[in-house]
């Protein structure tokens, strides 16, 4: 899909009314981890995107629309949401009980204290490979600085080679890894990798 010359890329804070599209994008970004969590929370017969939407409609929660920035394309006053980043300050609670779900436990071990944690970043397929993802990552850096943080962190699957290379190109480096517990809903096997970028 070619972007028209008069299309304008913009970033804006998400609103509660955006939570359905946030759920769709977060499902993409998590490569099955969100689907696993939402399936566990769903009522019998409930669409898991309904669960994701409901979770992101919450306020004063880490996984909230309040921690989401959307990237949009605007043309003639019409806005199309094409991607998003969900990020928040990561403060590790050393007294917290360890994650008791074996599928989720590896990810809970991959936390970088006092970092701006990018927990989800995604674009819809038609808008990939156009530099928009890099712009979203740069936007996260600006937001981290505004919050007084000097590093960013994220988790990537080692088998997601393209994403890992992008993060390395943007200055992220590996600091830890944990083996994934395989599950049919999770798209990758191998290791989950914690990557960090210092910005101050």
List where the protein language model places each region.
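Conserved GNAT-fold acetyl-CoA-binding loop/helix
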Residues: 31-56, 66-67
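A short helix-loop-beta-strand connector motif used in the catalytic cores of GNAT acetyltransferases and
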Residues: 56-70, 90-95, 117
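Conserved GNAT acetyl-CoA-binding A-motif
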Residues: 116, 137, 144-155
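Conserved acetyl-CoA-binding loop-helix of GNAT-fold acetyltransferases
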Residues: 123, 129-142, 146, 165-169
């Amino acid at each position: 899909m070619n972007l028209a010359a008069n299309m304008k890329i913009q970033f804006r804070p998400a609103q509660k009314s955006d939570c359905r599209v946030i759920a769709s994008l977060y499902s993409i970004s998590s490569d099955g981890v969100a689907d696993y969590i939402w399936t566990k929370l769903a009522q019998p017969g409930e669409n898991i995107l309904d669960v994701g939407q409901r979770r992101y409609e919450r306020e004063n929660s880490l996984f909230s629309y309040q921690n989401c920035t959307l990237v949009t394309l605007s043309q003639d006053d019409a806005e199309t949401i094409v991607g998003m980043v969900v990020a928040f300050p990561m403060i590790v609670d050393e007294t917290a009980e360890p994650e008791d779900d074996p599928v989720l436990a590896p990810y809970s071990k991959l936390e970088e204290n006092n970092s701006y944690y990018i927990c989800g970043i995604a674009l819809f397929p038609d808008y990939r490979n156009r530099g928009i993802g890099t712009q979203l990552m740069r936007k996260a850096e600006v937001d981290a600085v505004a919050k007084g943080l000097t590093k960013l962190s994220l988790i990537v699957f080692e088998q997601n080679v393209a994403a890992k290379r992008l993060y390395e190109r943007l200055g992220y480096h590996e600091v830890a890894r944990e083996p994934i517990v395989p599950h049919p809903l999770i798209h990758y096997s191998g290791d989950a990798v914690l990557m960090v970028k210092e910005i101050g």
